[in-house]
């Protein structure tokens, strides 16, 4: 069977990301902690791969890049030898290992192998199967992101404390097995019942642990969008932990106000500038200068639009607009001579 048409371009992207992923660690890319188990890595990979798969994001270059990053990170972190080298020596150590002919330096798992193990068909179809798994509660945290990070992209270090399940002395009753029995509810009538009877499982307890998480802020993210860390939520005995979700909220800014993909700001000019025109620039969020001057008259509260100077659209090369409201600063007093000159000019 022929390979899907997106495989070729994607392999080129994978080569680009083989050593490093835009400064992010492979654990950050897969949104898992450094000590994540292989099962946790696989589950996180599966969810992210489904989200950013090219079939679901046609003609979306940013999503294709993310998909390539995810596959490369998965290939490294599920190879025990590569993962040990990466954990100990970082990306440079991994480069040297592969350059010296280490296992997987040129071969190893390719993208079709990865998808065969998850979705079947050598990386083709995207038949999403939801697993029925008992999970703990998700934890949702409101995270204030600066306009600068939302404009240029950035990351935040966040301290996170959570409950972790640890072994404890003794045994406990659990849900690992049930016993079926029949109860008589009337003459010749019986009802099948189940009862939890296991008291052989080791006891557990909750312990609070903390660690720093790196939350990646992507350009153009909107209020309410979430950055998820799989299985970093509340734990579940005999199940899997829920997810930790950071819900993005735009932090107030001293100069700009965001409305969707547009930016708004207010600039004060003098009465003279309002009447005769002026030259003026303002500094944008990434420090580039925007020329907002005019040769004409500017009315109080006048709003001018500067196309393409707003916020970047999420996973797009386009940008919104910048709206500048002009406040005119009037003099508090005028001398009789000034009044006379103004009358002669304006009448």
From Swiss-Prot:
Compartments (UniProt record): Endoplasmic reticulum
Entry annotated with the keyword Lyase: no
The gene coding this protein: ERDJ3B
SMART domains in the cross-refs: DnaJ
Signal peptide (UniProt feature, chain positions): 1-23
Induction: By dithiothreitol- and tunicamycin-induced endoplasmic reticulum (ER) stress response.
GO terms for cellular component: cytoplasm; endoplasmic reticulum lumen
Role summary: May play a role in protein folding in the endoplasmic reticulum.
Subunit details: Interacts with BIP1.
GO MF assignments: protein-folding chaperone binding; unfolded protein binding
Chief localization: endoplasmic reticulum
InterPro entries in the record: DnaJ-B11-like, DnaJ_C, DnaJ_domain, DnaJ_domain_CS, HSP40/DnaJ_pept-bd, J_dom_sf
Domain J per the UniProt entry, residue ranges: 25-90
Alphabetical UniProt keywords: Chaperone, Endoplasmic reticulum, Signal
Protein name, per record: DnaJ protein ERDJ3B
One Pfam family, short name: DnaJ_C
Keyword Signal included in the entry's annotation: yes
Domain of life per record: Eukaryota
Alphabetical GO biological process terms: protein refolding
